Amino acid sequence: MKTKRRAFLQRATGLLGLTGLLSLVETKTGANGLPRKSSKAKKPYVVFVTGDHEYSGELTLPLIAAELEKNYGMRTKVLKSEPDYNGEKDIPGLEALREADLAVFFLRWRQLPQDQLNYIDEYLKSGKPVMGFRTTTHAFNYPDGDSRKAWNAFAEKAFGAPPGWGGAAKHTHYGHNSTTDVTVIPAAASNPILTGVAPSFHVASWLYRVQPDYPPKDATLLLMGKAVNPDKEAIDNPVAWTWKNGWGGRAFITTMGHPEDFQVEAFQRLVVNAIHWELGLPVPKNWKGKLDINVPYGHPKKS
């Protein structure tokens, strides 16, 4: 009797063990035997850091973020200056950069406290990719004597862009009544970031002067801009390039970013492509279609 009972228990234990093993396999592979996809693990996390006085970046970039989540399988978070876009000294939530796979900056003349700068510094030193729009060339504006003044050169260190507005690099633009004709640089025509981007298009952004000192010689220039109706003698200047910064991170920056630029399909595709490239993902071959973006310049008037 004891022998039969022992045999039964052994068979039951074996069956339970097999059931547990099958349960474990199904957890990892799914009932159909194919690998189960972890929705959190597979989705890149893109954090947008916004705060500018002029170009409504806190309104345009959330629309890009929504498109990434809806059609491109990404997770996003948009951080904004407080109490509003004019707030220069507080962008809550920067600790999100610790989990980010890509940090996207659209900043202008911020004076963040050191504890917030530390999150950006930590991110840069991780060697993860960075992306910047327009006024990020002069993201910070600390006065002489401030221990944080070195941050005024953020764009130079992170993107190979001029270290702030004016200065020795004579970083300027060609007037608020000008616009820009943009063309693909022939040598860059096969760059994946330019997949599906029209060979020429027009944007509302007045052209930024970055040459002759920037971008660095080891940058890859993608798009060239020509000022239309400039207020001074103008030279053609690159308006988008990539670079490997000193921390080993991929960098993409564009000096475009006027809210009307976001209505231009070529610009939209440039941005989506660049985000994929930054993350080391294949650039989408199938464009999901033009985004409906209609954000005013200068921020909406408050009621």
Where are these regions (language model features)?
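A glycine-rich, often tryptophan-bearing local segment used as a flexible ligand/cofactor-contacting loop or short
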Residues: 110-196
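Helical hinge/lid and interdomain linker segments adjacent to catalytic or ligand-binding clefts
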Residues: 47-48, 53-139
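C-terminal segment of N-terminal export signals and the immediately downstream linker at the start
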Residues: 22-46
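Catalytic beta-strand/loop cores that center a nucleophilic Ser/Cys/Thr
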Residues: 69, 75-77, 85-88, 99, ...
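N-terminal secretory signal peptides and thylakoid transit peptides that target proteins
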Residues: 1-19
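Non-transmembrane alpha-helical segments in soluble domains
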Residues: 9, 65, 121, 194, ...
